[in-house]
From Swiss-Prot:
InterPro entries: Cyt_trans-like (IPR004821), NadD/NMNAT (IPR005248), Rossmann-like_a/b/a_fold (IPR014729). It comes from Bradyrhizobium diazoefficiens (strain JCM 10833 / BCRC 13528 / IAM 13628 / NBRC 14792 / USDA 110). Transmembrane segments: none annotated. Keywords: ATP-binding, NAD, Nucleotide-binding, Nucleotidyltransferase, Pyridine nucleotide biosynthesis, Transferase. Catalyzes the reversible adenylation of nicotinate mononucleotide (NaMN) to nicotinic acid adenine dinucleotide (NaAD). Pfam families: CTP_transf_like. Its EC number is 2.7.7.18. Pathway: Cofactor biosynthesis; NAD(+) biosynthesis; deamido-NAD(+) from nicotinate D-ribonucleotide: step 1/1. This is Probable nicotinate-nucleotide adenylyltransferase. GO terms for molecular function: ATP binding; nicotinate-nucleotide adenylyltransferase activity. Belongs to the NadD family. HAMAP family: NaMN_adenylyltr.
């Protein structure tokens, strides 16, 4: 089975998360996408982070697709960093082929992630374009360091079968939603106050 992993705080989850997942399911020919709702993000201030249970329920409501599974795995296995989550999944679920899914905004700062080179060496990565982040993402330290492992976009369906490091930059999905834009200044979710 080919499984896409979309990690994040989902604070709040929104239609773009579902659209990204459905886009990845189709373009990467995945069987499932797992939303890994993190208990906290080491690169962000977590003061306005809603309770994990509330984010999980909201994510389930938004996902609304049987191929998208919402998980609090990182809380259960007590991992803080993506590399630890990926290593645990690969060790426990050896028969699955994983692809890490991220937006172009995350590629732009991927070099700040804990053990980002090891992440790239453990699992293929699909980067979903998020204009206007395209240039910044493709000019980022991580994109430059991994440039020789980039697949042409027309080979995206082969990504799950490629040994890491391998990555693809997928264009064509035009979305202008972000969790940051859906939060009020006090951290509450817009429309949920």
């Amino acid at each position: 089975m080919r499984v896409g992993l979309l990690g994040g705080s989902f604070n709040p989850p929104h239609q773009a998360h579902r659209a990204i997942s459905q886009f990845a399911l189709k373009r990467l020919q995945l069987d499932r996408v797992w939303w890994l709702v993190t208990p906290g993000n080491p690169l962000k201030e977590n003061g306005t982070l809603h309770e994990l249970g509330a984010r999980m329920q909201a994510a389930r409501d938004v996902a609304n697709d049987p191929r998208i599974e919402v998980s609090c795995l990182e809380s259960v296995i007590r991992t803080r960093y993506t590399i630890d989550t990926i290593n645990t999944l690969r060790r426990r679920l050896r028969g699955l082929r994983f692809v890490w899914i991220m937006g172009a905004d995350n590629l732009a700062q991927f070099h700040r992630w804990q053990d980002w080179r090891r992440i790239a060496g453990q699992v293929p990565i699909a980067v979903i374009d998020r204009p206007p982040q395209s240039f910044r993402a493709l000019a980022s330290p991580a994109a430059k360091a991994l440039s020789r492992y980039r697949l042409p976009e027309n080979e995206a369906a082969l990504l799950a079968d490629r040994p890491a490091p391998a990555w693809v930059f997928l264009t064509g999905l035009k979305l202008n939603l972000s969790s940051t834009g859906l939060r009020n200044p006090d951290g509450s979710w817009k429309g949920t106050k």
